[in-house]
């Protein structure tokens, strides 16, 4: 019974992920494309920005659904991989962008106020669930975040992008 409660707590916590993502999207959407295109040679369109974010929301809903139905080591690891890409690395990107630009960048407020605390909370719930070993969760977080971290580095410091 205690194991089921631990599993259920992390599953319930993940239900907030789509809402937190939408809050972040709403904050960054009015000015992100303009900000992004000021940093890279190969810019993006508003349409691409919307498609990427709608796809990210769909993936988030699928990942949360898989966790809710499965509640397995795989589903929890998948959730950590995805949230590490979507929230952890994205938050680092927005915070880094704020330091590089020395001013507010679109998405910075929700990255700091929602993404960082929410991701930390979910990660700790995942650890406490004891469903996946902590080292495996750390590896999942690194693997999930690496592409977005490289992408962010290229944008902020090289004027290019990975995808």
Residue ranges: model-predicted function:
Residues 4-8, 67-77, 126-136:
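Membrane-interface helix-boundary motifs at transmembrane edges
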Residues 53-70, 87-91:
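Core segments of transmembrane alpha-helices
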Residues 23-52:
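Interfacial loop at the N-terminal end of multi-pass membrane proteins
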């Amino acid at each position: 019974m205690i194991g089921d409660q631990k599993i259920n707590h992390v599953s319930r916590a993940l239900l907030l992920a789509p809402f937190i993502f939408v809050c972040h999207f709403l904050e960054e959407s009015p000015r992100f494309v303009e900000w992004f295109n000021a940093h890279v040679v190969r810019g993006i369109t508003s349409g691409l920005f919307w498609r990427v974010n709608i796809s990210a929301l769909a993936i988030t809903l699928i990942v949360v659904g898989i966790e809710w139905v499965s509640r397995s080591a795989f589903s929890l690891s998948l959730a950590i991989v995805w949230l590490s890409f979507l929230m952890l690395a994205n938050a680092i990107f927005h915070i880094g962008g704020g330091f590089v630009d020395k001013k507010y960048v679109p998405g910075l407020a929700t990255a700091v106020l929602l993404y960082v605390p929410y991701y930390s909370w979910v990660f700790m719930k995942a650890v406490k669930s004891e469903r996946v070993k902590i080292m495996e969760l750390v590896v999942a977080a690194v693997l999930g975040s690496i592409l977005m971290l490289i992408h962010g580095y290229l944008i902020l410091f090289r004027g290019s992008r990975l995808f």
